[in-house]
């Protein structure tokens, strides 16, 4: 079904069965599969390929040569109808690739809202990405990676399968991430190592000074006290009742499956 207000260039191909919402713009030489749903106000500039099953929300802008919803690069994939779901108001720049999920996981790749994916960024199968994140040029997420809200992943960075990146993290360019990065942490390198709290980012996002100080205390307890991980968690737990931000930090540590960067 194509809404009457949608604008589709004569050279674009939209397969029968695709659902195209109000005020959608599909530019020259785009291809939209039959199992695709595109929400109101989204724009495909030109030469964009969208395969399905894929659902794209409202007011996204997808630039030329992006490949959205293609089958994954997992050798176990056998043609199953797995999904990609994208939220609202994302900017997806040139040559970005986003793949559908696998049945070995939950069968779905999820991208939240208000994210920026710069040129050549890659989102592999079964990734889960929050809201208001930035992925710089050539940032690469392997399969099953989870990224929290308002994280920044620097250019040319690569994140190993199953790693988790916490809320408000900032990864420097060229980082190789093979373990989980706790919330609020700045990290960089090969292999990626922590070097402090994303203080400036937290200030910009409205965190109070006392909250930031509490987060810094938790960081120092974890990384600079010389305590074991279990002992550090016990110390950090003492501030979780007063500071929900510290509680989030501790919960991340407790849930980590791959271990945290050190």
From Swiss-Prot:
Pathway the protein contributes to: Glycolipid biosynthesis; lipid IV(A) biosynthesis; lipid IV(A) from (3R)-3-hydroxytetradecanoyl-[acyl-carrier-protein] and UDP-N-acetyl-alpha-D-glucosamine: step 1/6
Entry annotated with the keyword Thylakoid: no
Example of a GO MF term: acyl-[acyl-carrier-protein]-UDP-N-acetylglucosamine O-acyltransferase activity
Enzyme Commission number: 2.3.1.129
Binding partners and assembly: Homotrimer.
GO biological process: lipid A biosynthetic process
Subcellular location: Cytoplasm
Similarity comment text for this entry: Belongs to the transferase hexapeptide repeat family. LpxA subfamily.
Pfam families on file: Acetyltransf_11, Hexapep
Keywords for the protein's UniProt record, in alphabetical order: Acyltransferase, Cytoplasm, Lipid A biosynthesis, Lipid biosynthesis, Lipid metabolism, Repeat, Transferase
GO cellular component, one term: membrane
Protein name in the entry: Acyl-[acyl-carrier-protein]--UDP-N-acetylglucosamine O-acyltransferase
Function of the molecule: Involved in the biosynthesis of lipid A, a phosphorylated glycolipid that anchors the lipopolysaccharide to the outer membrane of the cell.
Enzyme class, UniProt record, top EC level: transferase
UniProt-listed InterPro entries: Acetyltransf_C, Acetyltransf_C_sf, Hexapep, Hexapep_transf_CS, Lipid_A_LpxA, Trimer_LpxA-like_sf
Keyword DNA damage appears in the UniProt entry: no
